Amino acid sequence: MSDETTVGGEAPAEKDDARHAMKMAKKKAAREKIMATKTDEKGLIIVNTGKGKGKSTAGFGMIFRHIAHGMPCAVVQFIKGAMATGERELIEKHFGDVCQFYTLGEGFTWETQDRARDVAMAEKAWEKAKELIRDERNSMVLLDEINIALRYDYIDVAEVVRFLKEEKPHMTHVVLTGRNAKEDLIEVADLVTEMELIKHPFRSGIKAQQGVEF
């Protein structure tokens, strides 16, 4: 029995492979043409926001990339300071020489129920954040859950925006996480990602679990 062939003796699978190769070659050429125009480098202002999971996780992913490359970086946690997390334990135990880690929050606002104390802690965290960002040895600074502090006006968003525009070193990346990012912050950012919530186990009665949420 002979294989099915097209006119000219080319098998259908071979014809599909040739078509695919040509299509991918065109995509590659177009991509390379675009990439050739992208030559600038700068420190990015990155905002991870939205109701979905993964805002802090994405931020820590970039921090771990920095650690892997031996690039000095820092983390300031504005809300989760009272919670023991896997990323905090790992960094403090094994990578403290590359990444500075500061937990200056005392928990979510509904846990503390003390606005004056929350404001004081947020302001303290912001002062530390500014210090770390000004230090040009730090290639990246993650401001974890700062958007929550901004949402409740614990910190003035205008001051944060002004600082990022006027005082952030040119090559320093700053990552700001938390839902409900303020429009003024979104406007000044270079990269904004909104995490969309489609399904969440909490709605099915499943609690936050070690290794997934913390």
From Swiss-Prot:
GO terms for molecular function: ATP binding; corrinoid adenosyltransferase activity. InterPro entries: CblAdoTrfase_CobA, Co_AT_N_dom, P-loop_NTPase. ATP binds at residues 50-56. The gene is cobO. The keyword ATP-binding applies. It comes from Sinorhizobium sp. It is an enzyme of class 2 (transferase). It is found in: Cytoplasm. Its cofactor is Mn(2+). GO terms for biological process: cobalamin biosynthetic process; porphyrin-containing compound biosynthetic process. Keywords: ATP-binding, Cobalamin biosynthesis, Cytoplasm, Manganese, Nucleotide-binding, Porphyrin biosynthesis, Transferase. This is Corrinoid adenosyltransferase. Required for both de novo synthesis of the corrin ring for the assimilation of exogenous corrinoids. Participates in the adenosylation of a variety of incomplete and complete corrinoids. It comes from the Bacteria. Its main location: cytoplasm. Its EC number is 2.5.1.17. One of its GO terms (cellular component) is cytoplasm.
